[in-house]
Amino acid sequence: MDCNNLLNAARRGEAELLTRLLNEGCSPDVQDDYGRTPLYYAAERGDVGTVDLLIKAGADPNARDREGKTPIIIATQSRKFGVIPLLSASAVGVEEALYTAARNGCHKAVRYMLARGVRPGASHGESLLHLVAGDAGLVKLLLEYGVDPNARDAHGKTPLHMASEHNCAQCVELLLKRGPDVNVKDGAGRTPLHYADDVDCIKLLLRYGADLNAVDNMGRTPLHYAEDGLAAEALLKRGARPVPDKYGELPTIPTC
């Protein structure tokens, strides 16, 4: 009996053949040369019926292929949300799947996992809120579920630094409403205003008390980092001073 046919049946969603092969004694966790199981392929296709059949037959929802991917991770990457409830009920690595969903902008999957009680930790020193700081919908969702808006990544950046760097005014406003320190400095001594290069972001940060002339570890102000002419103009109009940094270099003011 060639149990590799179980893999082919899962790839094609052939439920009758799957059932027969399982009844004949094939392991539901047979692997191909890539370390992938029938459940992996069913999850990748988003085949709810086949996923349910394999899990009931004892398939391991936590089996990883040679790239380290589990069925729930590949389902999330493939945006097959329908199978996530089945997989998340018995799978470990759901937090990893949550990061994958957020990274791919899969709002529905993120909402589902948060609603089931999955709470993100930090991945490589980066919180989930740092990761999605350019996506207002996900920022709002994570804040609603109590994710820390003041978390710092490995470089000392907060989500507000990241939202400013993304020039996402909606994200910046959502975070500012949570009351973070608008002048918090990262490991380079930069405040969120140092990263903002969008007029709307700059206006929001200043409205909440950002220091126009804060200096970083190199003695540079936000004006030194302004690459957009309108952003530079907004800073100057509100009182930014073109002072030299610690190397004696003045800001280069871009034109509009």
UniProtKB/Swiss-Prot annotation:
Keywords: ANK repeat, Repeat. PROSITE patterns: ANK_REP_REGION (PS50297), ANK_REPEAT (PS50088). Disulfide bonds: none annotated. It comes from Pyrobaculum aerophilum (strain ATCC 51768 / DSM 7523 / JCM 9630 / CIP 104966 / NBRC 100827 / IM2). It holds the Pfam family Ank. ANK repeats lie at residues 1-30, 34-63, 67-92, 93-122, 124-151, 155-184, 188-214, 218-245. PANTHER family: CYCLIN-DEPENDENT KINASE INHIBITOR 2C-RELATED, POLY [ADP-RIBOSE] POLYMERASE TANKYRASE. This is Putative ankyrin repeat protein PAE1861.
